[in-house]
Amino acid sequence: MSEFWLCFSCCIAEQPQPKRRRRIDRSMIGEPTNFAHTAHVGSGDLFSGMNSVSSIQNQMQSKGGYGGGMPANVQMQLVDTKAG
């Protein structure tokens, strides 16, 4: 008996190699351009109520650069995600 090998290249597609994400280190990150510091906002500021959020928005608008926006009423539900 003899062996007979036949290759069906049309049926077997070569699997693409998974793309590796390029690692970024500190030397690849440049200084910010056109940066304007307007306010400090922490997670505790949002939990203190909507008056605080409104105050932060007013503070940021007073610094300038926010003239293109339109006012909008937004309702947010805060969810406590404490790890047990």
From Swiss-Prot:
Keyword Cell membrane (UniProt): yes
Residue numbers carrying Phosphoserine: 43, 52
Intracellular or extracellular location(s): Cytoplasm, Cytoskeleton; Cell membrane; Cell projection, Phagocytic cup
One term under GO cellular component: plasma membrane
Ranges for domain CRIB: 29-42
GO molecular-function term, one example from the UniProt record: small GTPase binding
Lipid tethering residues (S-palmitoyl cysteine): 10-11
PROSITE patterns per UniProt: CRIB
Keyword check for Heme: no
Annotated keywords: Cell membrane, Cell projection, Cell shape, Cytoplasm, Cytoskeleton, Lipoprotein, Membrane, Palmitate, Phagocytosis, Phosphoprotein
GO annotation (BP), single: regulation of signal transduction
Topology class, membrane: Lipid-anchor
Oligomer and partners: Interacts with CDC42 (in GTP-bound form). Interacts weakly with RAC1 and not at all with RHOA.
Family per similarity comment: Belongs to the CDC42SE/SPEC family.
Domain remarks: The CRIB domain mediates interaction with CDC42.
Stated name of the protein: CDC42 small effector protein 2
Name of the gene: CDC42SE2
